[in-house]
Amino acid sequence: MRTLPHKLFAVTAILAIFPIIGPGSAAQTTKKKPKYNVLFISSDDLRPELGAYGLKDIKTPNVDKIASRGMRFDRAYAQYPVCNPSRASLLTGRYPTETKVMNNNDYFRRIDPSTVTLPQHFKNNGYVSLRSGKIFHGGIDDQVSWTEGGEPTDPNITERGNPNFRPTKPANSDPAQAQAQTAGVNIADSNSDRIVVLDGDGENHGDYRTATRAINFIEKYKDRPFFLAVGFVKPHSPPTAPKKFFDLYDVKKIPLPVDFGATPKALAGAPEISISPRNSDLFIGRESTPELSREMKRAYWASTSFMDAQVGRVIDSLEKNGLKDNTIIVFFGDHGYHLGEKGKWSKAYSLYELGLRVPLLIAMPNQKARSTTRIVELVDLYPTLADLCGLPKPTNISGDSLAPLLKNPNAAWDRPAYSVTQYRQSLGRSIRTSRWHYVEWDEGKSGAMLYATEKDPHELKNLSSDPKYAKTIAEMKQLLAKMPVIP
């Protein structure tokens, strides 16, 4: 359990969830609680900008379908704004300062071989644990966690080896045509900073094959309780999709952010360290003009819609095999992403709202569409799924079950979200409450930020140096002091 104060107890969480999951509570029957399957879907670099989140211009009908029968978490946060540390955290139920995974190359089990991961916990309790696509990280996986699918991640799926990006080429397309689709960037210059238009339906792309493998797993194990993790790479750079998904969007109608910049730069009043001066994914070493930025954002949206189509193929298979009513579906992004805000086209090192906030949906069988504005964290997924499926409570984890919020979106919940990043040998820490977002680097020695998030959702005005907010900053520091630190 986390050390932050709260009034939730394990008994409350367990009892509260039974009405959601239908008949079969201990008070009503002596039948053994059924083992629900878990379909655990992740998307890389995905912002909470989906139809289900109110952005109707972005076409994501299949993810929206998950939301239509589940809980939408409007304020869910990653614990680290980079893939490997974030995934290691949520899959172990521990904060990055506990896993000590603070970059894209560390492997959590080298640090703590005794760790029991989320899929491993299900595997140890009678489930078949299955992996398709990118779940832990490209080039880094954890074979002991899986019954099947634990082989090293295919770089053709993840588009990333370790530590360098691998080339991604449009399937069976003419090189000259592909070159014309790179928003002015030579393909040879960067495997990440380009736009890729696929032929056909994208059958040869890694995400399409990830969905196909997941479908095969569903058909193979439909008669056994399973934990199936499906990791889609898109919309991670390079933004990639078949042409029909680009055609969904009129580039002239794509908006630019209020704090758009040609190059990455912290706004006046914010510490320089808060924004890396060089993009690491898109617009690397070059300016992002409004015209090129709209083209890139269109490609990101097209890539999101392509990923959504693959989600639909997996959901359709679940329903085709009669598993809709006994499967919990989780859909989430692994961290946030900047699309030109403050000139940044990446997520790396960003402790801003955009770097940390993620989409999170949890659909229980027979549940209606609802939403909650309570602050939650990805580190909560491990204890939540163990709770919902009646597994023994995992030990040595820091997350808390979200079962009470699935029962009542307005349940008492006084938990903030804690996130960290390491940049230039400096440790940045973030605490997010319902009203405030506070960030400090090296305990404030290298800078700090305080934003009144309701009044300033774009985080334009840093209040950390205003003496009127000294009491608020002291309270935020007290919350940070209760969180794990690196020994």
Which positions does each model-derived feature cover?
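Bacterial N-terminal signal peptides that target proteins for export
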Residues: 1-12
